[in-house]
């Protein structure tokens, strides 16, 4: 019932705007102009006659209208709330405004519309099939479907342009394992974990026997509170799994003082406390990971790269305090859609993206700024966002 009242108010506002006059003593009917390219309903106050309304003008091209229309002509489409915004991000009110505009533009009988089914936002409207629009709007459904297709295709081209620039700058992404996106595995972070492990691990691509444990399994992870391996994995921004790379072909065994010739090549470790690895080992490991991990492959890196590239950050995000690493989402759903395109997930939303960002809190890569909506901060284990770091990477 409330939705029907709101829709009625929207239609009333449009009728008031159409039939109102600057002179309260005159209330002539509007002058309508119909173009061959599209129908534009205009209100002309300068050409009104005190004796009555002026008749309808015949078909004109867009260029002819531009030359003949006076400055006082009110274009409803230009004044509407939905202009300048992508249909996917329209609010319920903007959807109603757009439907009202289409009804007036096409001279459609509004009484035949099922108002109870118009209470939807832009994302829901864009997901409606042609048959659904015909069911709700009748013959007008074909016109609405065609207009939506044109509007959404233009906005998709803009997002694709940003993705293309990100890729040209070296921010490539890994294809999913036959999955539609990073958040369809039960947990919103499942695919992100898998991607991170695949990209950072030198074991990726090799095969293991049935009895040999794989990297990241319980046989390779260490236990205890004082082991450097466990604490170091939480400090690293490049990998989301614990790795023991002493068996990797990338690192020769002879280069590490803790290596013993008699250790088995695969299988479970011997009983006892896990061996402690030297600082040189971790320095070498970090160097290898930083060279092989592609840029922009993790969510926090994707956010960082948008912030540090002004040519890509067209009102998507902004720095609140660059020195402290504090930033804010300005168009959160647009950023989520970009991340969804990057991960081949068309159902990505900011709600899912924000849940994925929480995963980085424990690792101190990202921090939430208390009391401020859409505001976050890079943690001590993040990198590549400081001005001096950006300058060094460009040299």
UniProtKB/Swiss-Prot annotation:
Gene3D superfamilies: Transcription Factor, Ets-1 (1.10.150.50), Winged helix-like DNA-binding domain superfamily/Winged helix DNA-binding domain (1.10.10.10). SUPFAM superfamilies: SAM/Pointed domain, Winged helix' DNA-binding domain. Transcriptional activator that binds and transactivates ETS sequences containing the consensus nucleotide core sequence GGA[AT]. Acts synergistically with POU2F3 to transactivate the SPRR2A promoter and with RUNX1 to transactivate the ANGPT1 promoter. Also transactivates collagenase, CCL20, CLND7, FLG, KRT8, NOS2, PTGS2, SPRR2B, TGFBR2 and TGM3 promoters. Represses KRT4 promoter activity. Involved in mediating vascular inflammation. May play an important role in epithelial cell differentiation and tumorigenesis. May be a critical downstream effector of the ERBB2 signaling pathway. It comes from Rattus norvegicus. Residues 246-265 have a biased composition (Basic and acidic residues). PROSITE patterns: ETS_DOMAIN_3 (PS50061), PNT (PS51433). This is ETS-related transcription factor Elf-3. Residues 266-275 have a biased composition (Basic residues). GO terms for molecular function: DNA binding; DNA-binding transcription activator activity, RNA polymerase II-specific; DNA-binding transcription factor activity; DNA-binding transcription factor activity, RNA polymerase II-specific; RNA polymerase II cis-regulatory region sequence-specific DNA binding; sequence-specific double-stranded DNA binding. Keywords: Activator, Cytoplasm, Developmental protein, Differentiation, DNA-binding, Inflammatory response, Nucleus, Repressor, Transcription, Transcription regulation. The gene is Elf3. Its main location: cytoplasm.
